[in-house]
Amino acid sequence: CSLIHGYSLGFKFTFEADYLDDKNWVYDFGNCKWIKKYLEDNFDHTLAVDMNDPQMEDFKQLEGKGLAKVVEMSGVGCEKFAEHVFNYVAPQITNETAKRVRLASVEVFEHGSNSAVYLNTENV
């Protein structure tokens, strides 16, 4: 890749429902293409930078030179990425399924031994 970017991340989503649909599924994972696109747009070959980073102008200059794709976020790191993705996906899943399905958690992996989980605490 020709762009400066961070490390590889993995994402795990856990969905929950009080009852299964007519196919005996919690959620049809074939409907997850919009989630994949969101993850690619925000995390694939991107440079995630905290919106308050004092060097933001430097990062933007790299982007202007075609050296990076900068994604501004309110905090960075696996913990914040898990929270950020959860807050994007959860309401859409709830709306898409007429509140039948809830996003229970998002886990973000840095590599095999490190991860952070953001949990839905509304249903605990």
What residue ranges belong to the model's regions?
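Charge-rich, low-complexity N-terminal segments
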Residues: 1-124
